[in-house]
Structures are given as structure tokens and as C-alpha cells.
Swiss-Prot record:
Stated name of the protein: Nucleotide-binding protein Sama_3091
GO molecular function, one term: ATP binding
Signal peptide: none
Residues the record lists as binding GTP: 56-59
Pfam assignment, any one: PapZ_C
Length: 283
């Protein structure tokens, strides 16, 4: 089992790091009390082999001793990686002033500036215990995400999951689509009696549609559009891209086009899935 512990000063980017870990398949728990680390790992054993937790000033008193104690009690076979995120007092003060959020130690009736300094002193022992220290003072959220991925994966690029989803307009449009293409103007196998009961997954329907010049041109143009803009979408730090293809009933044309696009992009470095909403609904 892999365990990642993320600690750091409030406002330094722990929530960003946790989101990156979640995108990488980690089971993430924010602000977990230290004494619950062992029970959590025991409960997840066999179901989740990658776990990430964040700990901060709110978790425990006497942090250095408590953390050392809990880490010493980790089960055998746990591969531990730890991060500490830090920013300068000036940057943290600016971030809190901009967001108007309450610092965890501000409840102690101290000023924001005093709370930031106090937290830095209290967390200093932990910052010396971790594997990786990241100063986020001059990093934006994308650069911080890249830094975390670089440490864990040895590379900064994240795996973009591309989903090609077929659907029928008469059953409603999907709400989660990033791109949507209408295939209702293309030649329709529905009007061929022998093809009507079949789907875009069946060979006779495939043969019918692959002979249509308009269908091939439409697929090529969608492919060209996506290839042009994919690098820009990846740089936007997204995890999923859903391309919806719709025809009237979601049985023939949209299914065929979604399958063809999935095959063409399967050779790229992305993870590609083809989903067929109406066919799955009938299954």
C-alpha cells in the first residue's frame, strides 16, 4: 500500500495537492486525526492500495512526537511519501487577505499576521521530517500540481481521460459533455429495414456507415478539431474530457462515430473510453 502524507502551513496549497492525488487514484482524507491513520489503513486494506491524508495545525498537539509515534506504528509493507508545503509569511498574508478566510489559529484571538508566524513555528519540526519540501510562494495552482506529479510519477503531465459518449437527442442531452456533436443530418440506417433492429456496434451497420462520404468527413473533422485543441485542454489541468455524439435515438450513427473516434485516439498517450448511454440503458 502507498501512503502519502501532505502537511504544511494553512494557505500553502494542501487542498491543491490533495486534488492532484485524488486525480492520480488516491483515496484522500483531509485533516485526519493522527490516531486514526492506522485504523483507516486497516479498513482500506485490500480495497484501496493508494491512500493520501493531509494533516495540519488543527490535528494534534505536540505534533512532532505524535507524528513520529504514529509513523512508527504503520503496518509493514506501507510505502510512505511525505510532503510539506510552505510559503513565505508575506505571501500567506496576501492570500488570506484576498480570500477573506479565517486562519485556524485566528480563533486564539491573535491577529492574522501573528497566527501565520505562530503556525510556522509550531509546524517547523514536521517540516524537517518530510521527504519533500515544496515552497509554493511563487507557484500558481498548475505549477504546484506539476511539482506534486513530478515527485510521484517522475513526470509533470497528467493522464487525460477522453470519453466518447453516444446518446439520442430524443432522450435528452447529456449535461456533463465538454463538446457535443450532432449527427442527425447524416444518412440514417434506421430507414433500412434490415438494419433497424441493429446498433452501431453491429457489422452490417458499420459497413453501411463507412461507405458514406459525409460520415467519414464528419469523423475526420471532429478528430482534427480535437487533436488541435487537446494540448491546450491538457495544460488547463483537467482530468476528464467528454465528447458527446448525438443522433435521433442513440442507436446507430452516434454509436458508430463514438466507436470510430475512440479507436483513432486509442493510439495516443491518453486513456480513452467509449460509452453508449442509450445502449447501456437497454442492457
Amino acid at each position: 500500500m502507498k501512503l502519502v502524507i501532505v502537511s504544511g502551513r494553512s494557505g500553502s496549497g494542501k487542498s491543491v495537492a490533495l486534488r492532484v492525488l485524488e486525480d492520480l487514484g488516491y483515496y484522500c482524507v483531509d485533516n485526519l486525526p493522527l490516531q486514526l491513520i492506522g485504523p483507516l489503513l486497516a479498513q482500506l486494506k485490500g480495497n484501496n492500495d493508494k491512500v493520501a491524508i493531509s494533516i495540519d495545525i488543527r490535528n494534534m498537539p505536540e505534533q512532532e512526537k505524535a507524528l513520529e509515534k504514529e509513523l512508527a506504528r504503520l503496518p509493514e509493507g506501507v510505502e510512505l511519501t511525505s510532503f510539506f508545503l510552505n510559503s513565505s509569511d508575506k505571501v500567506l498574508l496576501k492570500r488570506y487577505s484576498e480570500t477573506r478566510r479565517l486562519h485556524p489559529l485566528s480563533r486564539s484571538k491573535v491577529s492574522l499576521q501573528e497566527a501565520i508566524k505562530l503556525e510556522g513555528k509550531m509546524l517547523a519540526p514536521i517540516s524537517n521530517m518530510v521527504d519533500h519540501f515544496i515552497d509554493t510562494s511563487n507557484l500558481n495552482v498548475y505549477e504546484l500540481a506539476d511539482a506534486v506529479r513530478q515527485i510521484l510519477l517522475g513526470r509533470t503531465d497528467k493522464e487525460l481521460v477522453i470519453i466518447f459518449e453516444s446518446f439520442g437527442f430524443k432522450h435528452g442531452m447529456p449535461t456533463e459533455a465538454d463538446f457535443m456533436f450532432d449527427a442527425r443530418f447524416l444518412p440514417n440506417p434506421h430507414w433500412e429495414p434490415e438494419l433497424r433492429p441493429l446498433t452501431g456496434l453491429d457489422e452490417p451497420v458499420k459497413l453501411f456507415l463507412e461507405r458514406q462520404v459525409l460520415v467519414n468527413k464528419y469523423i475526420w473533422q471532429i478528430e482534427n478539431l480535437l487533436e488541435t485543441w487537446l494540448p491546450h485542454l491538457e495544460r488547463n489541468n483537467r482530468s476528464y474530457l467528454t465528447i458527446a455524439i448525438g443522433c435521433t435515438g442513440g442507436q446507430h450513427r452516434s454509436v458508430y462515430i463514438a466507436e470510430q473516434l475512440a479507436k483513432r485516439f486509442a493510439n495516443s498517450h491518453h486513456k480513452v473510453e467509449a460509452r453508449h448511454r442509450e445502449l447501456n440503458a437497454k442492457a
